Amino acid sequence: MRHYEIVFMVHPDQSEQVPGMIERYTGAITGAEGKIHRLEDWGRRQLAYSINKLHKAHYVLMNVEASQEVIDELETNFRYNDAVIRSMVMRTKHAVTEASPMVKAKDERRERREDFANETSEETEAGDSEE
């Protein structure tokens, strides 16, 4: 079995269908003795350019280990599913399990926001105790 990185973009009006789609695709992979090494739902993001007059899409990234037959089946599903705007399947040399730069940046922003919130709450507590 080979390693693949799969990214697909879903129509923003169909975002509520994404969990079901992920479940269906991961079920097809694991049902054929494949493995899911990384699964990231990036959510709704701005597109770099318009696709079919759309400016946003729901992104999903998967790193999997699967046979060629399963990948062909997934590509066929992407092609005939009207909710999938674009998809890309790339073969990789090895399994990628670490978080993608998109998720790392999101976690970093969350940590900064929490640190800022903690600092401001400490300052307000210090201000309250001085009175």
From Swiss-Prot:
Which keywords annotate this record? Ribonucleoprotein, Ribosomal protein, RNA-binding, rRNA-binding
Task: Using the UniProt annotation, give all residue ranges assigned to the region (Disordered).
Answer: 98-131
Pfam families cross-referenced by the UniProt entry: Ribosomal_S6
Give me the stretches of Basic and acidic residues compositional bias. 104-116
The answer on whether this UniProt entry bears the keyword Magnesium reads no
Q: Where is the composition biased (Acidic residues)?
A: 120-131
From which residue to which does any coiled coil extend? Answer: none
GO:BP terms for this protein?
A: translation
Q: Which PROSITE patterns match?
A: RIBOSOMAL_S6 (PS01048)
For this protein, the record's InterPro entries field holds:
Ribosomal_bS6, Ribosomal_bS6_CS, Ribosomal_bS6_sf, Ribosomal_S6_plastid/chlpt, Transl_elong_EF1B/ribsomal_bS6
Q: PANTHER family, from UniProt?
A: MITOCHONDRIAL 28S RIBOSOMAL PROTEIN S6 (PTHR21011), SMALL RIBOSOMAL SUBUNIT PROTEIN BS6M (PTHR21011:SF1)
The record ties this protein, via HAMAP family, to:
Ribosomal_bS6
Protein name, please?
Answer: Small ribosomal subunit protein bS6
Gene name of this polypeptide: rpsF
